[in-house]
UniProtKB/Swiss-Prot annotation:
Modified residues annotated as Phosphoserine in this record: S44
Annotated GO MF terms: haptoglobin binding; heme binding; hemoglobin alpha binding; metal ion binding; organic acid binding; oxygen binding; oxygen carrier activity; peroxidase activity
Single biological process term from Gene Ontology: hydrogen peroxide catabolic process
Name of the protein described by the UniProt record: Hemoglobin subunit beta
Function recorded in the entry: Involved in oxygen transport from the lung to the various peripheral tissues.
Family matches, as Gene3D superfamilies: Globins
Highest taxon, organism lineage: Eukaryota
Residues bearing PTM N-acetylvaline: V1
SUPFAM superfamilies: Globin-like (SSF46458)
Gene responsible for this protein: HBB
Length: 146
């Protein structure tokens, strides 16, 4: 992902304020609610029968935290996202058979959740930088599929 110095600064400054557990759980939960077909990958998580059940499910929250932990690793290696996410790409492609489009959807949901959490601090410039990052991460996660 090519970011200007200003964009990198905007991304890392905001990310330093992110509660990974809270935002991760909310982002994954919203993905599962808005795109219910994605729930098929999480059948072992128990009750996903309603939006409230999804958003309050401890396994959804825990996995969301794990997902954003990996995203944090990506932010530390923006010039090598494919290498950073190679093992996760292989896992999601070969073992889990996740449609790579879901990575793009989750990235867009994450941007919405960040905007909701940070309000005016999530300026159009910050949003544009995050769109570049989530697109780069989604592309790296989809790499094994190509």
């Amino acid at each position: 992902v090519h970011l200007t110095g200003e964009e990198k600064s905007a991304v890392t400054t905001l990310w330093g304020k992110v509660n990974v557990e809270e935002v991760g759980g909310e982002a994954l939960g919203r993905l599962l609610v808005v795109y219910p077909w994605t729930q098929r990958f999480f059948e072992s998580f128990g009750d996903l029968s309603s939006p409230d059940a999804v958003m309050n499910n401890p396994k959804v929250k825990a996995h969301g935290k794990k997902v954003l932990g990996a995203f944090s690793d990506g932010l530390a290696h923006l010039d090598n996202l494919k290498g950073t996410f190679a093992q996760l790409s292989e896992l999601h492609c070969d073992k889990l058979h996740v449609d790579p489009e879901n990575f793009r959807l989750l990235g867009n949901v994450l941007v919405c959740v960040l905007a909701h959490h940070f309000g005016k601090e999530f300026t159009p410039q910050v949003q544009a930088a995050y769109q570049k990052v989530v697109a780069g991460v989604a592309n790296a996660l989809a790499h094994k599929y190509h």
